[in-house]
Amino acid sequence: MNKKLIYLLFFIPFISQNIKAQNINSEKNDSLYKDFKTEFIWEAKVKIGKTIDIGESKCGTRRVIPITGGTFSGPKIKGEVLPGGEDWQLVRPDGDTELYARYLLKTNEGHIFQVINNALIHVGDTNKSFYCKSVLDIEAPNNGPYGFLNHAIFLGTLKLPELKQNEEPYVIISVYKVL
């Protein structure tokens, strides 16, 4: 019998039981994830350029927003948002917006890492029901002080501030590590 097949037959039941055990509290039959705890990592002021409207596609309305720079800071990290990233958006037929942003951050010590931010934006009947949550994938150098960013799940929020007259457009992204 093939070694890979034997391996799969042996480990799949173990893995599936282990996953089930991690997700369900056997005493209450509740998800263990209902009480997430997070740690604030940074807040970024991300400057954005003029929207490039691609138009209607088979999936909805496509647009791209250039990321032109910015800054970020948190209790253990501080630096700049490098220009050159992009925020790809899809406005779905139901009105929600899917966001895929990819950009680089550079710390004050010169360490550069990549951020991929996947978000969902939903605006309800009133502007008070604005919902925007994201999951971030952060790729940092392993051998530096920020290698810990490679080993966690990060959640984010997005705020659209009111701009002052002649102020360059920007968004505020807050990032939290799931503990």
Where are these regions (language model features)?
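Beta-strand-enriched cores of mature, soluble protein domains
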Residues: 22-179
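Bacterial Sec-dependent N-terminal signal peptides
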Residues: 1-24
